[in-house]
Design a protein with these regions (language model features):
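Short glycine-biased active-site loop of nucleotidyltransferases that positions the nucleotide triphosphate
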Residues: 47-51, 97-98
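DnaQ-like (DEDDh/DEDDy) 3′-5′ exonuclease domain used for proofreading
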Residues: 122-183
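Carbohydrate-interacting/catalytic domains
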Residues: 1-47, 55, 59-64, 72, ...
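An anion/pyrophosphate-binding glycine-rich loop and adjacent beta-alpha core
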Residues: 356
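Short catalytic-loop micro-motif centered on adjacent basic/acidic residues
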Residues: 12, 227-232
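Hydrophobic or amphipathic alpha-helical targeting/insertion segments
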Residues: 74-121
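Catalytic P-loop NTPase motifs of RecA-like helicase/translocase cores
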Residues: 93, 236-237
């Protein structure tokens, strides 16, 4: 492996921020202290795509994102600045929403199984390819040698039509069938990404397909790309085999995988540096949450909302809904592999619901499969016979049924948990994050240290993250929300007022919105909150959903947001609570930032998060970043800034930690907790990475109520200098002195 970058900085490349634009900010990133430019997908994607995860041609750089010239400019700028380049790749699927834009899919639609690209896609060839694009007025036409439906165009098989032929008759002669868009979830004939019918699964298990789809990736490596981020490996038939092929293609690259690990789960033994950091995010988030607040938070939530379900029960319901409504075609395809098993579809679905992690990697993960089988039978004893018959096949790595089930369970977990249950279960939404368990109310200090020692020993080169393009809410939103675990009466007063105003609305969702208002704050652009609320309530899929919108209910929810702005009493309560949350929220934000930047692993800074940020789920977290303002503020920093609304303190902490990791990597080779004694000991996170010692304040409200640090002492040995404040210390130091100007410290010998 090449020397991994000391840190990365994620840039979202798109038409409005191209590779040329990225090249223009490389100098700023160098000054910030970043070690590598980390790019979102840059291969040719669907026209207008803002994210790039819908690649249409994996063999060329996206024209709208800067094309080959922009790519060359970015590489040159990074090389001149001494920065490495890391690229996000998407092997699991290709975008097919505009069939003509994907030449490989177009050819398959044209020639069917005889297409040279037929092996690229995971298609059920027992029937025509299902294309769910039609509305209620399925009026087709033939124009310019293509089948047309409004703006959609589809190819015609050679010899399948003649001038004057009836379009419906021509349609019947094709290798595909256009059907109503509502039929896709139940009738789709190809594997897709989660529930997105416009993202067709790619058969990377075929060596020829891997080689063909990775030619541009291989040339990127030859051009100097140092690292790869692999999107959604769990969608592949055999992620481990894929990673082995990728490691042979790029033997010196730093490779991380977007593998979502459940609490306690370990990454399989793949030839990768580690994950993309959601596991680290869960640990950092958790240690800033007051475990002692759980009982009160649970009681308050149940009393105000009437929601008596646990997180586990919400996840079960979410998964069941996803399988009943959306992943029907996937379940049917698997059940079709066991035609002699009565209730095979119900049994397959029940095991997927019961699966406690995203998926197994047979023969690894048998214990998780066995647990799921037992739980499935307990929940549905009438399926015992079907489960017993299917069990040997589900355990067989060579059985297509087992392979497809493993792909199904990951989609079920993601859609049922992150995209459904996390929008329904609103006890404490700071915990409702990718890779986290909403039922796990924080992480204790000793457990946090133990987890970092495991990380240092097992995956010291794994990525760590606080915010990504996929997080449910940004890092500082979660930092502010964490304060609510320490505020009882004050938080309840506002939450109760919001719920009371939610006439005709789901009380739990109103409670969810009340927390969102605290996490984001009184932003000037309330339309952001309206857009977020629309997405959140439709993802929850209770009173309203994407495919069955209840306009009256949605108007009521949006009116509740307007009340927070326009009703004097509610606005006053909101602002009073925000005033209480502000300073401890800043403390949490600085603490978690420094911890993430200095803990074992390679830290990533998501674009713009070196200043305070208030982002919510995508697309809100892909808003433009004002790099000119960040460059100006960075240049103005000459010493320790005040902690205030400017965000200068966060920028100072970020750049100081990044520069130290870049310039003195030898200080970050181990992990050991540093003893803290005194009345405030549980409010300090302190660890030594081998010469770089981090101290961060946790649970700041409780600390203030106890009178501050008092007699609390950090057990230093010898001489140290805090690179954040410039102050030097020799031997044990009072935290009241060490943390007098900032709630964090970064000491070096």
């Amino acid at each position: 492996m090449v020397t991994p970058p000391p840190s990365t900085y994620r840039l979202q490349i798109r038409k409005s921020f191209t590779l040329d634009d990225a090249a223009a900010v490389v100098g700023y990133l160098r000054e910030l202290g970043v070690g590598a430019v980390y790019l979102s997908p840059i291969l040719q994607s669907t026209t207008g795509s803002d994210h790039g995860y819908d690649t249409t041609d994996p063999l060329r750089i996206d024209t709208d994102r800067g094309g080959e010239s922009g790519w060359s400019a970015l590489l040159a700028a990074a090389t001149d600045a001494g920065l490495q380049v890391v690229v996000d790749i998407v092997p699991n699927h290709l975008g097919i929403s505009a069939a003509r834009e994907n030449p490989y899919w177009w050819d398959v639609l044209t020639h069917g199984r005889e297409s040279p690209y037929a092996a690229w896609f995971d298609i059920d060839w027992s029937r025509p390819i299902t294309v769910p694009v039609l509305g209620d007025d399925a009026v087709l036409s033939v124009a310019d040698g293509e089948l047309a439906y409004y703006e959609h165009r589809f190819p015609l098989a050679p010899g399948s039509w003649a001038a004057g032929d009836d379009p419906d008759a021509v349609h019947e002669r094709q290798h595909y069938r256009l059907v109503h868009h509502s039929r896709g979830d139940a009738e789709l004939s190809y594997r897709r990404f989660f529930t997105v019918t416009t993202l067709a699964g790619v058969r990377q298990e075929d060596p020829a397909v891997f080689e063909a789809t990775h030619r541009r990736v291989a040339s990127m490596i030859a051009e100097g790309v140092a690292g790869l981020r692999v999107d959604h490996p769990d969608g592949l038939v055999d992620p481990g085999e894929y990673q082995e092929r990728l490691a042979r293609l790029a033997p010196d690259a730093w490779i991380t995988v977007e593998k979502i690990l459940e609490p306690g789960e370990r990454l399989p033994d793949w030839p990768v540096a580690g994950t993309t950091g959601y596991d680290a995010m869960r640990e950092v988030n958790g240690v800033f949450v007051d475990l002692a607040g759980e009982a009160a938070a649970t009681e308050r939530y149940r009393r105000l909302t009437g929601d008596g379900l646990t997180s586990t029960e919400h996840v079960e319901q979410g998964k069941r809904m996803i399988l009943d409504r959306l992943l029907v075609a996937e379940v049917r395809r698997i059940a079709g592999l066991a035609p002699d098993v009565a209730d095979a579809d119900a049994a397959i679905a029940e095991v997927a619901i019961a699966f406690g992690v995203y998926r197994s990697y047979l023969p690894d993960g048998v214990a998780d499969l066995d647990k799921a089988l037992v739980l499935a039978e307990q929940r549905r004893p009438e399926l015992a016979a079907a489960l017993a018959t299917l069990s040997p096949r589900l355990h067989d790595p060579a059985d297509e049924l087992a392979r497809r089930f493993q792909q199904l369970s990951g989609a079920t977990m993601a859609k049922g948990t992150e995209d459904t249950a996390f929008y329904r279960y609103a006890r404490f939404i700071a915990l409702n994050e990718v890779g986290a368990d909403a039922g796990e109310f924080g992480i204790g200090l000793d457990d946090f240290h133990a987890l970092q020692q495991v990380r240092q020993q097992g995956q010291p080169l794994s990525m760590t993250s606080l915010s990504t393009h996929d997080t449910e809410r940004g890092e500082d939103v979660r930092a502010r929300l964490a304060v609510l675990a320490e505020l009882g009466e004050e938080w309840e007063r506002f939450a109760a007022a919001v719920v009371a105003r939610a006439e005709g609305s789901n009380a739990a969702f109103a409670y969810f919105l009340a927390q969102t208002l605290v996490g984001v704050g009184a932003v000037e652009d309330r339309d952001r909150l309206h857009a977020y609320a629309e997405k959140a309530m439709r993802e929850a899929s209770q009173e309203t959903r994407w495919t069955a919108v209840d306009e009256e209910y949605e108007r009521g929810v949006q009116a509740l947001i307007d009340l927070a702005y326009d009703d004097a009493a509610l606005r006053d309560g909101w602002e009073r609570l925000l005033a209480l949350v502000e300073e401890p929220g800043w403390s949490n934000a600085l603490g978690q930032k420094l911890v993430q930047l200095t803990m074992p692993g390679v830290p990533d800074v998501y674009q713009g998060t070196e200043l305070w940020e208030d982002s919510l789920v995508d697309p809100d977290n892909r808003r433009p970043v004002d790099f000119a303002e960040r460059r100006r503020l960075l240049a103005s920093l000459t010493g320790t800034p005040r902690v205030d609304g400017s965000g200068a303190a966060k920028l100072w902490v970020t750049t100081t930690a990044l520069r130290l990791r870049r310039d003195r990597p030898e200080l970050f080779g181990s992990y050991a907790p540093v003893p803290v004694t005194g009345s405030g000991a549980q409010h300090a996170i302190a660890y030594d990475r081998g010469g770089a010692l981090t101290v961060a304040t946790r649970l700041p409200v409780g600390l203030a109520r106890a009178g501050g640090w008092g007699d609390t002492v950090l057990g230093l040995e010898g001489g140290w200098t805090d690179v954040l404040s410039g102050h030097a210390y020799d031997g044990p130091v009072r935290l009241a002195d060490l943390l007098a100007s900032l709630p964090v410290a970064l000491l070096v010998r």
